[in-house]
């Protein structure tokens, strides 16, 4: 047994006192054996002896904290002190030694395969500890990892335990669904050595997921509302044309100033795949709209449009402008000018209505050409979504004013052709001719006299 696995020492030589050094020695040896790319024959059945006092359980205790740094340093020293674990196992000089080592494993005793089985289980335990440190343990259970490492105990065919995939960090048949769920929820993949790495250094996230909720800046205390900020919106604030720094982004998200506030924000963004370097300078000028999240900016634009539609004196303004040009020679030219202005304004409104700039959690498909859409998107990003709806509301109000001007000109020209005076002119003449005086009486009543 010692010839096959020189790194495993008998119990009589090493005292099993539960110390970390002994556990790490088992870890370094068993992991190196399990990671060796060896093909096993299906002709040698795997049997388990009734009693195995020669081999201690390779599992760590439940309260054991796995430290990869100590393991790496100890494993390096362990490789140079034991000839069976060759650090130059993939070089050409050790080819003959690797073939001899393969023959020893291939014709080994059935008990030798127990070590390989324990090594796989030990690697699963180490993988469990690493994923717990990354905070992604909720995405799967240890029972699922046991399915990947414990062959026939969970329904796998007995001969499949001899395949090299389960001991080399490769998922067995039927484990694709488990691996896909772990990748989707944690953004983690298994490398060739059974370790855990991040896919591209970031977690896989959905841009429409909620990043935080921000209280409104413009709302009164009696009607305070919160607006949801998505990951896509935070990415837009960090991207051109604004390229906000940590201080401005923290102000938008209404984060309290603290000593490590910028570092905590950068770490949270880094976990989501967003890069916010320290010492970054903003690229655009800061305005009052910069402090608004997109939800509040859209709310402000909607209230502005409603106020313009209901409260702006469009009829009075339109008639006042049309009354400045009541000469018969000017009326026809004035009508043509108003109609041309209405047509141009309508074309401008139609263009803005086709704007498909990304806002909130929506990213609609562009309708306009990219040459004009990118400019509209730039304006929308600078104003946080307030600009285009506000301009549309102003254009709608302007269209109403032009319509009132046109109605007044048509009515005035019709009255001129029939010879009937205008109603406004009648009212003005009546105000001049009729002068009413009010005199109080003894009874306290008001008496009207002409």
UniProtKB/Swiss-Prot annotation:
Q: Where is this region: H-S-H (helix-span-helix), dimerization?
A: 280-410
Task: Cite a single Pfam family from the UniProt record.
Answer: TF_AP-2
Q: Which GO terms describe its molecular function?
A: DNA-binding transcription activator activity, RNA polymerase II-specific; RNA polymerase II transcription regulatory region sequence-specific DNA binding
Which stretches does UniProt call biased (Basic and acidic residues)? Answer: 432-450
Q: Which domain of life is it from?
A: Eukaryota
Query: What are the start and end residues of every segment in region (Disordered)?
Result: 414-450
Q: What biological-process GO terms show up in the record?
A: positive regulation of transcription by RNA polymerase II; regulation of cell population proliferation
Report the locations given in the UniProt record: Nucleus
Assign the protein's first listed, main location to one coarse class.
Answer: nucleus
Q: Which InterPro entries does this entry report, sorted A to Z?
A: TF_AP2, TF_AP2_C
- Provide this UniProt record's keywords sorted from A to Z: Activator, DNA-binding, Nucleus, Transcription, Transcription regulation
PANTHER family according to UniProt: TRANSCRIPTION FACTOR AP-2 (PTHR10812), TRANSCRIPTION FACTOR AP-2-DELTA (PTHR10812:SF5)
Q: How does it assemble?
A: Binds DNA as a dimer. Can form homodimers or heterodimers with other AP-2 family members.
What family does the Swiss-Prot or TrEMBL record give for this protein? Belongs to the AP-2 family.
What function does this protein fulfil? Sequence-specific DNA-binding protein that interacts with inducible viral and cellular enhancer elements to regulate transcription of selected genes. AP-2 factors bind to the consensus sequence 5'-GCCNNNGGC-3' and activate genes involved in a large spectrum of important biological functions.
Protein name stated in the entry = Transcription factor AP-2-delta
Q: Which organism is it from?
A: Danio rerio
Lineage runs: Eukaryota, Metazoa, Chordata, Craniata, Vertebrata
């Amino acid at each position: 047994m010692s010839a096959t696995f020189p790194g495993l020492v008998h119990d009589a030589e090493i005292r099993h006192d539960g110390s970390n050094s002994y556990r790490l020695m088992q870890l370094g040896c068993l992991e190196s054996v399990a990671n060796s790319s060896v093909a096993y024959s299906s002709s040698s059945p795997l049997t388990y002896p009734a009693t195995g006092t020669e081999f201690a359980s390779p599992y760590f205790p439940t309260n054991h904290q796995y430290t990869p740094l100590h393991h790496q340093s100890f494993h390096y020293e362990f490789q140079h002190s034991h000839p069976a674990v060759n650090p130059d196992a993939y070089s050409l000089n050790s080819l003959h030694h690797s073939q001899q080592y393969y023959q020893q494993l291939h014709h080994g005793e059935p008990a030798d395969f127990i070590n390989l089985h324990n090594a796989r289980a030990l690697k699963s335990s180490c993988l469990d500890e690493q994923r717990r440190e990354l905070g992604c343990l909720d995405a799967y259970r240890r029972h699922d990892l046991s399915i990947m490492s414990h062959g026939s105990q969970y329904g796998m065919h007995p001969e499949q335990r001899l395949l090299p995939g389960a001991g080399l960090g490769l998922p067995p048949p039927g484990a694709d669904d488990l691996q896909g769920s772990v990748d989707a929820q944690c953004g983690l993949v298994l490398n060739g050595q059974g370790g855990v790495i991040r896919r591209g250094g970031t977690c896989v996230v959905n841009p429409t997921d909620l990043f935080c909720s921000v209280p409104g800046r413009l709302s009164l205390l009696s009607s305070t509302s919160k607006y949801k900020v998505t990951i896509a919106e935070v990415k837009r604030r960090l991207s051109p044309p604004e390229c906000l720094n940590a201080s401005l982004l923290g102000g938008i998200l209404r984060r309290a100033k603290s000593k490590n506030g910028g570092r905590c924000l950068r770490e949270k963004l880094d976990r989501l795949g967003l890069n916010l370097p320290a010492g970054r300078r903003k690229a655009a000028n800061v305005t009052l709209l910069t402090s608004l999240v997109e939800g509040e900016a859209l709310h402000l634009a909607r209230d502005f449009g409603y106020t313009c539609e209901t409260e702006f004196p469009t009829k009075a303004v339109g008639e006042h402008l049309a009354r400045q040009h009541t000469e018969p020679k000017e009326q026809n030219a004035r009508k043509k000018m108003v109609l041309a202005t209405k047509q141009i304004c309508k074309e401008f409104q139609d263009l803005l209505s086709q704007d498909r700039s990304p806002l909130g959690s929506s990213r609609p498909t562009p309708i306009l050409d990219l040459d004009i859409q990118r400019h509209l998107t730039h304006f929308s990003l600078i104003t946080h979504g307030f600009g285009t709806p506000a301009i549309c509301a102003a254009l709608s109000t302007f269209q109403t004013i032009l319509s009132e001007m046109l109605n007044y000109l048509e009515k005035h020209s019709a009255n001129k052709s029939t010879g009937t005076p205008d109603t406004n002119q009648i009212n003005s003449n009546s105000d001049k001719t009729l002068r009413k005086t009010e005199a109080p009486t003894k009874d306290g009543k008001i008496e009207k006299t002409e």
